[in-house]
């Protein structure tokens, strides 16, 4: 592959896709993203690429955007953008919010393709094994053609990556009688980046288990009773249990 040409593919024959998205962590903890547009070589009228950072507290490096135009071809079983031209100055990257952008590419002629590169950075210390999620989409006018989801795993240098293998069990009890209470709804939020893990409801035994957690600190709030915040620090892989007491009605 000539110096400066970007390639995508591997041992299996590459498929023709309207849009792909991949991400890679760099040693400085930034994430480099690559979006390929129109490997399928179609004509796409009024084309637009949108992008959303699904993981909270990740920011775009706004001066890192590069846009290349050329023709996607398969060489040595890989996609390569041939005859590429840097057309960054011809397009405006617009940011409706800090967690999304879009680029209006206009009409893409048959056989034309684009490669969009940019960086993003976390605004907090990532945990080893943590996954950062990002979604790119290709549109033609108001019609979405395809989504591409990039899930990029952060691995700490020299460290292990246990990942999302932790869980915690909540047990809601009546403060007076000690009996288990069903139907209590708890919202679990990760303290490090403010990501809402989800809302969880206790079953007939008054218990609910929250799975797939990182080893980290979380805030647990009962949302259907105006309950107080509870802090939970996940320290070990075994299921931990918090007993939560409530005054009877």
Regions inferred by a protein language model and the residue ranges of each:
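Solvent-exposed loop/turn and edge beta-strand elements of beta-rich ligand-binding domains
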Residues: 1-249
């Amino acid at each position: 592959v000539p110096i400066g040409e970007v390639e995508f593919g591997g041992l299996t024959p590459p498929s023709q896709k309207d849009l792909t998205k991949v991400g890679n962590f760099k040693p400085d903890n930034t994430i480099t993203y690559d979006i390929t547009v129109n490997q399928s070589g179609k004509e796409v009228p009024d084309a637009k690429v949108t992008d959303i950072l699904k993981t909270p507290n990740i920011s775009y490096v706004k001066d890192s955007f590069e846009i290349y135009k050329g023709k996607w071809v398969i060489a040595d079983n890989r996609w390569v953008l041939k005859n590429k031209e840097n057309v960054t100055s011809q397009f405006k990257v617009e940011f409706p919010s800090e967690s999304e952008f879009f680029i209006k590419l206009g009409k893409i002629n048959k056989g034309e393709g684009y490669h969009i590169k940019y960086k993003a950075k976390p605004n907090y210390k990532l945990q080893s094994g943590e996954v950062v999620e990002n979604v790119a989409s290709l549109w033609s006018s108001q019609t979405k053609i395809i989504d591409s989801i990039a899930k990029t795993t952060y691995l700490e240098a020299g460290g292990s990556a246990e990942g999302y293998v932790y869980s915690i069990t909540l047990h809601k009890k009546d403060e007076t009688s000690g009996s288990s209470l069903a139907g209590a709804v708890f919202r679990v939020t990760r303290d490090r980046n403010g990501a809402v893990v989800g809302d969880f409801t206790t079953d007939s035994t008054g218990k609910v288990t929250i799975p797939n957690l990182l080893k980290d600190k979380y805030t647990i709030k009962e949302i259907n009773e105006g309950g107080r915040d509870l802090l939970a620090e996940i320290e070990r892989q075994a299921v931990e249990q918090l007993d939560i007491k409530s005054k009877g009605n």
